[in-house]
Curated annotation (Swiss-Prot):
GO molecular function annotations of the record: ATP binding; guanylate kinase activity
Reactions the enzyme catalyzes: GMP + ATP = GDP + ADP
Major site of localization recorded for this protein: cytoplasm
Organism for this UniProt entry: Pectobacterium atrosepticum (strain SCRI 1043 / ATCC BAA-672)
Homology family: Belongs to the guanylate kinase family.
Protein name: Guanylate kinase
Domain of life: Bacteria
Length: 207
């Protein structure tokens, strides 16, 4: 069976990364594509389920996993740990399922160092003005917070050149099509097709 592909997807806040991934998953069967589920030490919130939203673990268990090098990447955010389990990812990839990992550029660097075969995608907004409009449209932040987010977004976008693919999310449907096209092209790579169609190729080349 051909291995699945790990896709690292990064973008500044407001570029539409999460929306694109969720829209993609709705069009792909579960046995083809899944989203990575992180481990965390934070408390479970109402409506969240273990193994669906996060893998909820105690701090001691998380630290043990760090010591045993079980994480592709991990970080501490506001006193809670978050991390991506390498064994969990590899187990899914071994079944031929593609895995999408929504992560920032710093986490992406950590993962590429440990899994260079992963494919990475960066998503850009069509303009700074549109990015600011989307952030304001959420109605959650003050002008001061939005200005800070915009400054952070510019810093994040300077890392686009570290990625394999670049998508500009101006028209959502077109950006989603671009994302699907990347997946389709990766699945047609010779290394995967040789395994997938091994029996056919053997018959075609038999004397």
């Amino acid at each position: 069976m051909a291995q699945g592909t790990l896709y690292i997807v990064s973008a500044p806040s407001g570029a539409g990364k999460s929306s694109l991934i969720q829209a993609l998953l709705k069009t792909q069967p579960l046995y083809d594509t899944q989203v990575s589920i992180s481990h965390t030490t934070r408390a479970k919130r109402p409506g969240e389920n273990h193994g669906e939203h996060y893998f909820f673990v105690e701090a001691d268990e998380f630290k043990r996993m760090i010591q045993d090098s079980e994480f592709l990447e991990h970080a501490e955010v506001f006193g809670n740990y978050y991390g991506t389990s390498r064994p969990a990812i590899e187990q899914v990839l071994a079944t031929g399922v593609d895995v999408f990992l929504d992560i920032d550029w710093q986490g992406a660097q950590q993962i590429r160092a440990k899994m260079p075969q992963a494919r990475s995608i960066f998503i850009l907004p069509p303009s700074k003005e549109e990015l600011a409009r989307r952030l304001r449209g959420r109605g959650q932040d003050s002008d001061e917070v939005i200005a800070r987010r915009m400054s952070q977004a510019v810093a994040e976008m300077t890392h686009y050149g570290e990625y394999d693919y670049l998508i500009v999310n101006d028209d959502f449907d077109l950006a989603l099509l671009d994302l699907k096209t990347i997946i389709r092209a990766e699945r047609l790579r010779l290394s995967r097709q040789k395994i997938r169609h091994d029996a056919l190729i053997t018959k075609l080349l038999a004397d």
